[in-house]
A protein has these predicted regions:
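Generic detection of long, well-ordered alpha-helical segments
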Residues: 30-33, 79-83, 227-228, 256-260, ...
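Non-catalytic nucleic-acid-binding/docking modules located in mid-to-C-terminal regions
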Residues: 48-53, 96, 121, 142-144, ...
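A generic alpha-helix structural signal
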Residues: 33, 37-40, 86, 90, ...
Length: 307
């Protein structure tokens, strides 16, 4: 059995930036909705998942924000045109009958990691759809990361190539490099290559900190010794919490039949002609009434939907 876990907000953003300047005839922005829905169709069509779920970030501040006020503080606010589309994308997910998870005060990455670990322990092959390198911490065994847009599969071997250490030690590398996206400080002046070399030569980050004599380069040795508190903080911020109280019942995650009439209604509203064509014949809601169109522009739109 397999389980596909979608990092919701990650793909909302990717869809938003992948397609520009798309809206319906009423001027309602639809680019993210269209791109995200296409991704769902592609995933369901090509991978035919046995089970599937989407995980969303909560707007409530997390434990990471409590221990470090600057966590993600540099990120610009979500664009208004994307904000307005998120409720619609959530309705699309609901119409596809895809279960969703969201926990106030917890990040999607932690929830994804927790579900993935529990499912893998139950013998399920897990594929996480996320572009966040933090998720590479949980890769290994039955857990892989899959990017449907690039059609790339990241397994344990790929993580080792990238970070120079096994997945469970990725956070140690990030403790030194920091992460500009999440505003994790790390040690200024230490890049990924240097961090990989340092961490791969010791059994743990603590060993590197407790035994600076193992660092041959005097400049690096000084950088580590002068930033011990920052390094420990950065590791805490970078480490996923995969022990959340999340109930994972695979029976409730089984991929169900989409609510085609609901999808048809939304696609018509958003004027997604190409997506309407993907709804199977039996899924189209039959109309018992007719409409009279007297406006030329309305006729053009109607013919586009029908075509």
């Amino acid at each position: 059995m397999n389980l596909y876990l979608i990092d919701g907000h990650s793909y909302f953003y990717r869809a938003f930036h992948a397609i520009k300047n798309l809206s319906n005839s009423k001027g309602v922005p639809t680019n993210a909705i269209f791109g995200f829905t296409n991704m769902l169709f592609k995933l369901l069509r090509e991978k035919k998942p046995d089970a599937i779920a989407i995980v969303l970030d909560s707007p409530v501040p997390t434990e990471r924000h409590r221990i470090y006020e600057e966590y993600k503080a540099q990120r610009p606010g979500m664009p208004d045109d994307l904000v307005s589309q998120i409720p619609h994308m959530k309705k699309i997910v609901e119409a596809f009958r895809i279960p969703s998870f969201e926990m106030p005060g917890y990040e999607a990455d932690d929830i994804l990691g927790t579900i993935a670990k529990k499912a893998a322990a139950a013998g399920v092959d897990v594929f996480i759809l996320s572009g966040d390198k933090d998720m590479m911490q949980v890769v290994g065994g039955r857990i892989n990361i899959y990017d449907p847009m690039k059609e790339v599969l990241i397994d344990e071997a790929a993580v080792i190539v990238k970070f120079g250490v096994p997945p469970e030690r990725v956070a140690e590398v990030m403790a030194l490099t920091g992460d500009a996206i999440d505003n994790i400080p790390g040690v200024k002046g230490i890049g990924e290559k240097t961090a990989k070399d340092l961490i791969s030569c010791v059994c743990s980050l603590d060993e590197l900190i407790d035994h600076p004599e193992k660092i041959k380069n005097e400049r690096l040795r000084k950088m580590i010794s002068e930033n011990i508190d920052t390094i420990r903080l950065s590791k805490t911020l970078a480490t996923l919490d995969t022990g959340l109280q999340v109930e994972v019942d695979m029976k409730n995650l089984t991929a169900g039949k989409p609510d085609w009439p609901a999808l048809q209604k939304m696609f018509s509203e958003f004027e997604f002609t190409s997506l309407l064509k993907l709804i199977p014949a039996e899924g189209h809601k039959q109309r018992a009434s007719y409409i009279t169109i007297t406006d030329k522009n309305a006729l053009t739109i109607f013919l586009g939907l029908k075509g």
